[in-house]
Amino acid sequence: MHCPFCRHPDSRVVDSRTTDDGTSIRRRRQCPDCSRRFTTVETASLMVIKRSGVTEPFSRTKVISGVRKACQGRPVTEDALAQLGQRVEEAVRATGSAELTTHDVGLAILGPLQELDLVAYLRFASVYRAFDSLEDFEAAIAELREHRLPAERSGGGTCGTGTVPVPAGTAD
Protein backbone atom coordinates (compact mmCIF):
# COMPACT_ATOMS: atom_id res chain seq x y z
CA MET A 1 0.00 0.00 0.00
CA HIS A 2 1.47 3.35 -1.02
CA CYS A 3 1.93 5.93 1.73
CA PRO A 4 -0.44 8.86 1.04
CA PHE A 5 2.10 11.31 2.52
CA CYS A 6 5.45 10.42 0.96
CA ARG A 7 4.31 7.94 -1.75
CA HIS A 8 6.64 5.21 -0.43
CA PRO A 9 5.51 1.98 -2.12
CA ASP A 10 5.20 -0.07 1.07
CA SER A 11 3.59 0.15 4.51
CA ARG A 12 3.30 -2.00 7.62
CA VAL A 13 -0.05 -3.03 9.13
CA VAL A 14 -0.14 -1.96 12.80
CA ASP A 15 -3.74 -2.96 13.61
CA SER A 16 -6.67 -4.67 11.85
CA ARG A 17 -10.33 -4.67 12.92
CA THR A 18 -13.65 -5.41 11.31
CA THR A 19 -16.10 -2.55 11.06
CA ASP A 20 -19.27 -2.50 13.18
CA ASP A 21 -21.43 -3.91 10.39
CA GLY A 22 -18.86 -6.62 9.65
CA THR A 23 -18.64 -5.92 5.93
CA SER A 24 -15.23 -4.22 5.90
CA ILE A 25 -11.80 -4.43 7.50
CA ARG A 26 -10.23 -1.28 8.92
CA ARG A 27 -6.41 -1.38 8.89
CA ARG A 28 -4.10 1.06 10.66
CA ARG A 29 -0.83 1.29 8.70
CA GLN A 30 2.55 2.90 9.21
CA CYS A 31 4.99 4.00 6.55
CA PRO A 32 8.56 2.65 7.06
CA ASP A 33 10.02 5.71 5.32
CA CYS A 34 8.28 8.73 6.94
CA SER A 35 6.82 6.85 9.98
CA ARG A 36 3.43 8.50 9.57
CA ARG A 37 0.28 6.46 10.19
CA PHE A 38 -2.83 6.23 8.06
CA THR A 39 -6.02 4.15 7.91
CA THR A 40 -7.37 2.06 5.07
CA VAL A 41 -10.76 0.38 4.80
CA GLU A 42 -10.96 -2.77 2.72
CA THR A 43 -14.23 -4.16 1.40
CA ALA A 44 -14.69 -7.19 -0.83
CA SER A 45 -16.58 -6.09 -3.90
CA LEU A 46 -19.79 -7.92 -4.64
CA MET A 47 -21.05 -7.62 -8.20
CA VAL A 48 -24.54 -8.35 -9.53
CA ILE A 49 -25.01 -9.58 -13.09
CA LYS A 50 -28.26 -8.22 -14.49
CA ARG A 51 -30.42 -10.01 -17.08
CA SER A 52 -29.02 -7.76 -19.79
CA GLY A 53 -25.51 -8.96 -18.94
CA VAL A 54 -24.49 -5.64 -17.40
CA THR A 55 -22.55 -5.98 -14.13
CA GLU A 56 -22.99 -3.49 -11.30
CA PRO A 57 -22.01 -3.36 -7.61
CA PHE A 58 -24.44 -4.90 -5.11
CA SER A 59 -26.56 -2.20 -3.47
CA ARG A 60 -28.35 -2.77 -0.18
CA THR A 61 -30.23 0.48 -0.87
CA LYS A 62 -31.57 -0.98 -4.12
CA VAL A 63 -32.76 -4.12 -2.30
CA ILE A 64 -34.56 -2.03 0.32
CA SER A 65 -36.11 0.18 -2.37
CA GLY A 66 -37.51 -2.84 -4.23
CA VAL A 67 -38.89 -4.41 -1.06
CA ARG A 68 -40.35 -1.06 0.05
CA LYS A 69 -42.55 -1.09 -3.08
CA ALA A 70 -43.89 -4.53 -2.14
CA CYS A 71 -44.51 -3.31 1.44
CA GLN A 72 -46.43 -0.19 0.37
CA GLY A 73 -49.52 0.16 2.57
CA ARG A 74 -48.36 -2.64 4.89
CA PRO A 75 -47.42 -2.24 8.58
CA VAL A 76 -43.67 -2.55 7.92
CA THR A 77 -41.24 -0.08 9.54
CA GLU A 78 -38.12 1.42 8.00
CA ASP A 79 -36.09 -0.35 10.70
CA ALA A 80 -37.54 -3.68 9.59
CA LEU A 81 -36.64 -2.87 5.98
CA ALA A 82 -33.09 -1.94 7.01
CA GLN A 83 -32.73 -5.21 8.92
CA LEU A 84 -34.05 -7.13 5.92
CA GLY A 85 -31.52 -5.37 3.68
CA GLN A 86 -28.71 -6.32 6.06
CA ARG A 87 -29.88 -9.96 6.21
CA VAL A 88 -30.00 -10.14 2.41
CA GLU A 89 -26.51 -8.66 2.07
CA GLU A 90 -25.14 -11.06 4.70
CA ALA A 91 -26.77 -13.99 2.89
CA VAL A 92 -25.34 -13.09 -0.52
CA ARG A 93 -21.88 -12.39 0.94
CA ALA A 94 -22.00 -15.74 2.77
CA THR A 95 -22.15 -17.52 -0.59
CA GLY A 96 -18.50 -16.61 -1.04
CA SER A 97 -19.07 -15.66 -4.65
CA ALA A 98 -17.81 -12.32 -5.96
CA GLU A 99 -20.51 -12.25 -8.66
CA LEU A 100 -24.20 -13.07 -8.30
CA THR A 101 -27.13 -12.91 -10.68
CA THR A 102 -30.23 -10.83 -9.98
CA HIS A 103 -32.00 -14.19 -9.61
CA ASP A 104 -29.70 -15.10 -6.69
CA VAL A 105 -30.39 -11.76 -5.01
CA GLY A 106 -34.14 -12.25 -5.49
CA LEU A 107 -33.95 -15.69 -3.87
CA ALA A 108 -32.07 -14.16 -0.93
CA ILE A 109 -34.87 -11.58 -0.50
CA LEU A 110 -37.79 -14.04 -0.53
CA GLY A 111 -37.00 -15.83 2.76
CA PRO A 112 -36.61 -12.79 5.04
CA LEU A 113 -39.54 -11.04 3.31
CA GLN A 114 -41.81 -14.03 3.93
CA GLU A 115 -40.95 -13.81 7.65
CA LEU A 116 -41.56 -10.05 7.65
CA ASP A 117 -44.94 -9.81 5.89
CA LEU A 118 -46.85 -12.42 3.89
CA VAL A 119 -48.74 -9.94 1.71
CA ALA A 120 -45.53 -8.09 0.81
CA TYR A 121 -43.92 -11.47 0.11
CA LEU A 122 -46.74 -12.41 -2.26
CA ARG A 123 -46.48 -9.04 -4.05
CA PHE A 124 -42.71 -9.36 -4.45
CA ALA A 125 -42.93 -13.01 -5.51
CA SER A 126 -45.59 -12.17 -8.11
CA VAL A 127 -43.16 -9.82 -9.86
CA TYR A 128 -40.00 -11.86 -9.19
CA ARG A 129 -41.53 -15.13 -10.37
CA ALA A 130 -43.49 -13.37 -13.17
CA PHE A 131 -46.97 -14.55 -12.20
CA ASP A 132 -49.19 -14.23 -15.27
CA SER A 133 -52.37 -15.99 -14.19
CA LEU A 134 -54.70 -16.37 -11.26
CA GLU A 135 -53.50 -19.97 -10.92
CA ASP A 136 -49.97 -18.73 -10.20
CA PHE A 137 -51.29 -16.65 -7.30
CA GLU A 138 -53.43 -19.53 -6.03
CA ALA A 139 -50.45 -21.89 -6.11
CA ALA A 140 -48.30 -19.41 -4.18
CA ILE A 141 -51.03 -18.89 -1.57
CA ALA A 142 -51.50 -22.66 -1.22
CA GLU A 143 -47.74 -23.00 -0.73
CA LEU A 144 -47.84 -20.33 2.00
CA ARG A 145 -50.72 -22.10 3.74
CA GLU A 146 -48.91 -25.44 3.63
CA HIS A 147 -45.79 -23.83 5.05
CA ARG A 148 -47.67 -22.09 7.88
CA LEU A 149 -50.04 -24.85 9.06
CA PRO A 150 -47.34 -27.21 10.49
CA ALA A 151 -45.68 -24.26 12.27
CA GLU A 152 -49.00 -23.19 13.82
CA ARG A 153 -49.73 -26.71 15.09
CA SER A 154 -46.38 -26.77 16.89
CA GLY A 155 -47.12 -23.38 18.49
CA GLY A 156 -44.66 -21.48 16.33
CA GLY A 157 -45.19 -19.41 13.24
CA THR A 158 -43.11 -17.61 10.69
CA CYS A 159 -44.43 -14.12 11.26
CA GLY A 160 -46.74 -12.16 13.48
CA THR A 161 -49.36 -11.41 10.85
CA GLY A 162 -51.74 -14.15 11.98
CA THR A 163 -53.13 -17.00 9.94
CA VAL A 164 -53.70 -16.98 6.23
CA PRO A 165 -57.50 -16.76 5.90
CA VAL A 166 -59.35 -19.39 3.90
CA PRO A 167 -61.74 -17.79 1.39
CA ALA A 168 -65.47 -18.39 1.98
CA GLY A 169 -66.81 -21.50 0.29
CA THR A 170 -63.52 -23.44 0.46
CA ALA A 171 -63.69 -24.45 4.13
CA ASP A 172 -64.23 -28.13 4.98
Swiss-Prot record:
InterPro entries: ATP-cone_dom, NrdR-like_N, RNR_NrdR-like. Disulfide bonds: none annotated. Keywords: ATP-binding, DNA-binding, Metal-binding, Nucleotide-binding, Repressor, Transcription, Transcription regulation, Zinc, Zinc-finger. This is Transcriptional repressor NrdR. Its cofactor is Zn(2+). Residues 152-172 are annotated as: Disordered. Negatively regulates transcription of bacterial ribonucleotide reductase nrd genes and operons by binding to NrdR-boxes. Pfam families: ATP-cone, Zn_ribbon_NrdR. Residues 46-136 form the ATP-cone domain. Residues 161-172 have a biased composition (Low complexity). A zinc finger (unnamed) spans 3-34. PROSITE patterns: ATP_CONE. Coiled coil: none annotated. One of its GO terms (biological process) is negative regulation of DNA-templated transcription. Belongs to the NrdR family. One of its GO terms (molecular function) is ATP binding. Binds 1 zinc ion.
